[in-house]
């Protein structure tokens, strides 16, 4: 019986959910491009958030979010999250209650509609392995991240192979230090079970996002950065059990 339900669920995804999500994606991208002058407005952000939420709505996936009370929507933060699958993006974009810009790999700029929409929305593209381009991205972030506009980073750098939290790279902490912004851990669970990096179809599974408490790193000394990175990783792992 479970096999039959799984087959029917995949047929539904292919014939109904995917076409509807594609239409919503095109509508959201076009709307964002047309109204990009208001890229930091709540009404445009809400349209983009609905696009992300529609991924979960169309697949009937239960979503639970905790820790919203830990942050202030008028304060700029650097959010760091574990990266289990593509489903992470839709969970964060749909339910993180702040206006934010992704720090995302430059290759995504070439994806039809999504790349153009992300550029119009003001998300920050980073060329990995290019120091000069990374510096330019940091300078762009300095211009954008103020008055409650935040950024979200996946410090592992790539999706998890097994759902476990990998090693955190220094970049996220360095950006928070350079911009003098508090850093907030986000813990995601269930997204790997929904769609890991090797799967094309989604699986039915509940997901959870926990927003941790802001961490002030403005006085962090250089020699303490490796320890702080590991403590941040531990905070993300701990939040997965909330």
Functional labels for PLM-detected ranges:
Residues 51, 88-91, 104, 113, ...:
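Hydrophobic alpha-helical segments typical of transmembrane helices
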Residues 65, 79, 102-103, 209-211:
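Generic preference for hydrophobic
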Residues 66, 103-105, 127-128, 155, ...:
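Thr-Gly-centered strand-to-loop micro-motif
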Residues 25-49, 56-60, 72-131:
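Catalytic core of membrane glycerolipid acyltransferases/transacylases, capturing the structured
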Residues 1-33, 46, 69-72, 227-242:
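Membrane-interfacial terminal anchoring regions of lipid-handling membrane enzymes
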Residues 4, 8-11, 135-242:
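Non-catalytic C-terminal accessory region of glycerolipid acyltransferases
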């Amino acid at each position: 019986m479970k096999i039959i339900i799984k087959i029917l669920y995949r047929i539904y995804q292919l014939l109904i959910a995917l076409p509807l999500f594609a239409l919503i994606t095109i509508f959201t991208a076009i709307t964002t491009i047309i109204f990009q002058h208001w890229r930091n407005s709540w009404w445009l952000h809400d349209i983009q958030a609905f696009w992300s939420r529609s991924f979960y709505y169309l697949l009937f996936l239960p979503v639970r979010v905790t820790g919203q009370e830990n942050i202030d929507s008028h304060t700029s933060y650097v959010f760091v999250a574990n990266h289990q699958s593509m489903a992470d993006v839709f969970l964060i974009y749909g339910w993180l209650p702040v206006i934010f810009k992704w720090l995302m790999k430059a290759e995504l700029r070439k994806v039809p509609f999504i790349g153009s929409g992300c550029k119009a929305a003001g998300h920050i593209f980073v060329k990995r392995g290019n120091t000069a381009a990374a510096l330019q991205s940091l300078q762009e972030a300095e211009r954008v991240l103020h008055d409650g506009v935040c950024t979200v980073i996946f410090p592992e750098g790539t999706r998890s192979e097994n759902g476990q939290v990998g090693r955190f790279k220094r970049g996220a902490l360095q950006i928070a230090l350079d911009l003098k912004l508090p850093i907030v851990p986000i813990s995601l669970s269930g997204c790997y079970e929904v769609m890991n990096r090797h799967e094309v179809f989604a699986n039915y599974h509940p997901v959870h996002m926990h927003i941790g408490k802001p961490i002030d790193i403005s006085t962090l000394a250089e020699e303490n950065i490796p320890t702080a990175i590991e403590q941040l990783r531990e905070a993300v792992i701990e939040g997965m059990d909330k």
